[in-house]
Amino acid sequence: MHELSIAESIIELLEEHAVTHKFKKVTKIILEIGVLAGIEKSALFFCFDVAAQNSLAEGAELLIEDKLAQGVCQNCHLQVTTTGWYEPCPYCGQLLINITEGEQMKIKSLEVEN
């Protein structure tokens, strides 16, 4: 379950930002996760609650926004949006899409208290 290590990394990032930006508590976190990131959202919610115990993020609301994948078709060279690895190009039908975006995860926004 790599979601636990992801949740722990999020807490570490929050603690680093708390020192830099001088806040004491996180009340809300919005993550943006690519649909191809391989992260199980329900597991991440559970693991985040566990990792946040006794931290500045304990009790924080965690929201996750999906980010669609983007790619470029190697056949027709058009940029396409996709939700899976092996979907055909909507323009030419070929299965030759190079994924350029959609595997990442980022903290999109935070709500904090001083």
From Swiss-Prot:
Domain of life: Bacteria
Keyword hit for S-adenosyl-L-methionine: no
Keywords attached to this entry: Metal-binding, Nickel, Zinc
PROSITE patterns, per database record: HYPA
Transmembrane portions of the chain: none
Family designation: Belongs to the HypA/HybF family.
UniProt name for this protein: Hydrogenase maturation factor HypA
Source species: Psychromonas ingrahamii (strain DSM 17664 / CCUG 51855 / 37)
